[in-house]
Amino acid sequence: MRQSSTLTWTSVLLAPLAASKGLIADYASCQSACVSLSSQLSVESVGNYIAEFEQQPIAGAGVEAGSLYWSQQQQALRPACLVHAREAQDVALVVQTSRSTGCPFAVRGGGHSDIPGFSNSHGGITVNMAGLGDVKVDASAGVARIGAGAKWGAVFKELDKTNKTVVGGRLTGVGVGGLLLGGGLSHLSGLHGLACDNVRNYEIVLANGSIFDVSHSTHPDLYRALRGGGNNFGVVTRFDLDLYDQGPMWGGLHVWPLLPSVTSAITSAFAEFGHEAPSDKHVSLFAGLGFMQGNFAWAVGQYDTLGREEPPIFSKFRDDAETYGAPKLVKTARVTSLSDLAEELNLSEPAGMRSRFTTATFRMDVDLLQLMAGYFVEEVERALENGLREDKRFAPMLGIQPLTKNILRAQSKRGGNVMGLDEESGPLIVCSFGWEWFRETDDAVVIAGIKSVLEKSVAAAKEKGLYHPFKYMNYAAEDQDPIASYGAENVEFLKKVRHTYDSDGLFMKLVPGGHKI
């Protein structure tokens, strides 16, 4: 009775706020849903989210040490109740309760999306999957069974003990579920493709509350749809991933100051790598032009899964004062574990900030990369002049990552994914325009700056015949439609699969977060 009273109080307190924002169609349905859940799950499984939220620090060194959600925009939302799922049956009960009451819900895996409502429900039910975070290694079967509530840091720490790994994320604080359902760029993608292409089996809760194991052999249509189709078909509670041998890796960050000579050298080396990468599948690379603590700088991440220091394919990124015109400011490259490399990258994205990402894809071209760098600097300087100079935590970034032919070729395994890319499309540049700031009052300035960089870059690419319609789901903004970018044939396939497994459209209507079909 006490727990039910607490949940009722939370819903009543929330009702005026939710109604004013138009985010709840019927708050009474969610009050009913929360009371019903509290009577069927243990007291520990349903929490007073407002009380729990107040106990969380707003800003920390990273997601693990800070808030429930990585971005302020998600953390600010208030669900009617928070369900702490411990097993797939708990998730099934939430789905059934949502269906019977009409109360919307959201699923929090790692909580790393910056888009409000993607993994937190304002006025509805939020399912916290952290209790479904087990990592079980079956070396004899060549598979790692990973709960959907795990984060990649915990996954890699467990796998490091076995000298095995999986194709997964690159930051410790990113959740397993979101990354795998949206694609997943990895240090191992050159060898094995995107992370989603290395899922052997999904345990999923469907719209009717049933729990199924889905693989290429059991449900080939749903299996393919889940490889890039997002959260449109059910709630995945476990991912069974292909297991690979992995010893110590070489890798780290290389940082230069922003100079015309540095921009020229890095963009040229990046484009050359994009074309040459198929000759060495054991390496991976990304680059970014950023602004932090008053300075612009280029950062390049270089990685080798064999542990080779400075492999030849990275020769153009070595210190060369004549080419770069400046020495490196930072070099962290070393031979270490995959979990250590993931922790290093996680430190670059502290929790508790406001954040916005958007994305675009272009064909590999040096001149376009240099134009984009110019657009980025121009818009950041404009934002600084319009109040962001006062925000010492303002950290915009233009990120570029190669989708090489070998990565694209590996997508075809087990029937392929739904993203509409093939080897002949490459090499491509996947861009992430990701800006972080602290004050809500600066939202308009920041969003205008991001939009301008994106629009100018797209316009330049189209003029040069370098534009590609693909939008990578894991970097896409709320107002972008990555699924439409997969092409008409794949969209029709996804609609058919959705109708087969969710004919009433529960995951379209009652799970408003996520990119929809």
Swiss-Prot record:
InterPro entries: FAD-bd_PCMH, FAD-bd_PCMH-like_sf, FAD-bd_PCMH_sub1, FAD-bd_PCMH_sub2, FAD-linked_Oxidoreductase, Oxid_FAD_bind_N. Glycans are attached at residues 163, 208, 346. SUPFAM superfamilies: FAD-binding/transporter-associated domain-like (SSF56176). It comes from the Eukaryota. Its EC number is 1.-.-.-. Disruption phenotype: Leads to complete loss of terpestacin and fusaproliferin production and accumulates oxo-preterpestacin I. Pathway: Secondary metabolite biosynthesis; terpenoid biosynthesis. Keywords: FAD, Flavoprotein, Glycoprotein, Oxidoreductase, Signal. The modification Pros-8alpha-FAD histidine is found at residue 112. It is an enzyme of class 1 (oxidoreductase). Its cofactor is FAD. Residues 75-246 form the FAD-binding PCMH-type domain. Belongs to the oxygen-dependent FAD-linked oxidoreductase family. FAD-dependent monooxygenase; part of the gene cluster that mediates the biosynthesis of the mycotoxin fusaproliferin (FUP) that belongs to the class of bicyclic sesterterpenoids. The product of FUP1, preterpestacin I, might also serve as a substrate of FUP4 to yield oxo-preterpestacin I. This is FAD-dependent monooxygenase FUP4. The lineage of its organism: Eukaryota, Fungi, Dikarya, Ascomycota, Pezizomycotina.
